[in-house]
């Protein structure tokens, strides 16, 4: 197989057959993987190791999803529940930072080893759980190059008519370029579930009614105030002129009624960009005023500052080389509430518009904090020391390549993961056929806010944010990765998998997607060997192979 040179952010690497310029060509593979998330990479690596010929087909030019787009402060949960190739990834990250040349802007000994629920570096284990985006991308590229994985970038699935099915199986998928990818089996590794939906597989968008599966943490969460992403007891007026309803609502407020706790809807938790910032002036791009900037969008934040809000920098999470993975924190933050509702089912053109709108909102927020006179001077001065990291996302002016799609479509599969699986409460009879675990989750039930509304008392408040602790790691059932057999027999979905909104809030972490991608490819290898539907894979054999490959399937195997 011919190797094509693929330049990436300041260095040259080699990836097998990265196709950007061929059109109207037919390709044949054992396994076609659509998407660029970490699950796509782990699936391709595992498929190759098991003797299959995979191809990754992805719209993105950078493979690795959010792990290469700013999410470097890993939501690891219990690190002992992360095994197999996913753990190998974090070991490779650790080894990358053992090289002196990795520390360009900071001495290694000056790095504070803090992480999300764990140390950034676990020296005894040889793993590292925080990293710069370009380092993650280099690891993924080297991983794929070692196996000569065929990667086709810049390829958008024709979602209207590109999926050809015969006798309940996908035969081929076509992209908007006119290329056709034929395969025996397929994996949807997108955050949105685009291939799954185009193949006619049932899915959900938004929040189920809590009564459907007997869940407490699903549906409308009005009155639930977890974390600190809300307006506390400040009694902030939602109106442009405080206390005057005739003046109209401030920007970024949903005019709908508070609603009923537990009631389902199609609202989607908020997205943001995980921005890689730096306070090192040698490597900093100052925040600039975005197109269409309007400080009125951030009026509610100004009112929070007037009430004494002082947590602006709470989620400027430090990674190596004086950089951050900057997430959201506080009552009005980087999450653009309401901007996510359309995304899962939107056209590519509409998603591009929404991505720009998110960027303008978020860049406007940073500019507002650094410049607006309503912001306390000490906060403005502190914010002005921050900017985008010049050596990250170089092709994109220091801004992340991808928005953080925290939740898109969710498949309705053979089994539906619910909060009961995560919390250890009795399963609901409607969850479907259970096979057994093919990986573990351990993060809390975590949903970001869904909307900002006016309370019955006439004040502004947020709704949808939950953070419910998971006592122990739990198994993620193989049945949640496969569609109902009547809908498709040769597709596995390790990212937009079958889970309720509540359960997905725990599952939806990058290392979990990575380990599920490996499990999906392992299942495909057995299905291909036996000529079976993915729903008919021998689970005991699958589980045995996963354990042999270092995957963690039960709590007794977990080690911190």
PLM regions: where:
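Beta1/beta-strand and adjacent pyrophosphate-binding region of the FAD-binding site
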Residues: 27-37
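Bacterial N-terminal signal peptides
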Residues: 10-20
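Aromatic pocket-lining residues of Rossmann-like dinucleotide-binding sites
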Residues: 47
């Amino acid at each position: 197989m011919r190797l094509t040179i693929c330049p990436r952010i300041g260095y040259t690497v080699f990836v097998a057959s990265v196709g950007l310029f061929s059109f109207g060509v037919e390709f044949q593979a054992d396994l076609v993987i659509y998407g660029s998330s970490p699950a796509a990479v782990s699936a391709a690596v595992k498929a190759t190791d098991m003797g299959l010929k995979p191809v990754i087909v992805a719209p993105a030019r950078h493979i690795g999803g959010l792990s290469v787009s700013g999410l470097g402060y890993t939501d690891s949960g219990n690190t002992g529940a992360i095994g197999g190739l996913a753990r190998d990834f974090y070991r490779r990250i650790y080894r990358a930072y053992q090289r002196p040349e990795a520390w360009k802007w900071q001495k290694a000994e000056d790095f504070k080893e803090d992480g999300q629920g764990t140390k950034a570096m676990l020296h005894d284990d040889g793993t590292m759980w925080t990293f710069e985006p370009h380092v993650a991308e280099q690891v993924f590229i080297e991983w794929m190059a070692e196996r000569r994985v065929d990667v086709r970038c810049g390829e958008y699935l024709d979602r209207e008519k590109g999926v050809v099915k015969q006798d309940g199986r996908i035969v081929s998928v076509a992209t908007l370029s006119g290329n056709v990818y034929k395969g025996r089996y397929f994996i949807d590794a997108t955050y949105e579930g685009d291939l799954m939906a185009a193949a006619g597989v049932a899915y959900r968008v938004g929040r189920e009614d809590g009564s459907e599966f007997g869940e407490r943490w699903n549906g409308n969460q009005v009155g639930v105030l977890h974390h600190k992403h809300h307006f506390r007891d400040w009694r902030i007026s939602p109106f442009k002129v405080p206390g005057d309803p005739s003046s109209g609502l401030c920007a970024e407020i949903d005019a709908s009624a508070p609603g009923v706790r537990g009631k389902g809807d199609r609202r989607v938790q908020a997205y943001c960009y995980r921005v890689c910032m730096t306070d090192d002036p040698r490597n900093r791009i100052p925040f600039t005023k975005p197109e269409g900037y309007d400080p009125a969008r951030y009026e509610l934040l100004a009112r929070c500052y007037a009430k004494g809000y002082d947590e602006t920098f709470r989620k400027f999470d430090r990674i190596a080389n004086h950089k951050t993975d900057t997430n959201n924190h506080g009552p009005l933050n980087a999450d653009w509430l309401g901007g996510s509702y359309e995304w899962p089912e939107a056209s590519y053109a509409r998603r591009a518009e929404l991505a720009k709108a998110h960027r303008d909102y978020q860049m406007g927020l940073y500019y507002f904090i650094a410049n607006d006179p309503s912001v306390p001077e000490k906060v403005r001065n502190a914010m002005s020391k921050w900017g985008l990291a010049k050596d990250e996302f170089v092709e994109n002016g220091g801004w992340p390549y991808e928005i953080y799609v925290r939740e898109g479509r969710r498949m309705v599969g053979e089994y539906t993961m619910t909060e009961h699986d995560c919390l250890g409460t009795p399963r609901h009879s409607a969850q479907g056929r259970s096979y057994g675990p093919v990986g573990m989750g351990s993060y809390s039930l975590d949903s970001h806010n869904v909307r900002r509304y006016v309370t019955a008392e006439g004040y502004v408040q947020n709704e949808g944010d939950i953070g419910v602790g998971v006592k122990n790691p739990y198994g993620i059932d193989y049945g949640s990765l496969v569609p109902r057999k009547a809908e498709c027999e040769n597709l596995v979905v390790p990212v937009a998998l079958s889970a309720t909104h509540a359960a997905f809030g725990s599952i939806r972490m990058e290392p979990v997607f990575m380990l599920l991608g490996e499990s999906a490819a392992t299942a495909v290898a057995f299905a291909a060997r036996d000529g079976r539907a993915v729903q008919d894979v021998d689970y005991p054999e699958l589980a045995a192979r996963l354990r042999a490959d270092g995957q963690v399937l039960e709590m007794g195997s977990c080690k911190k």
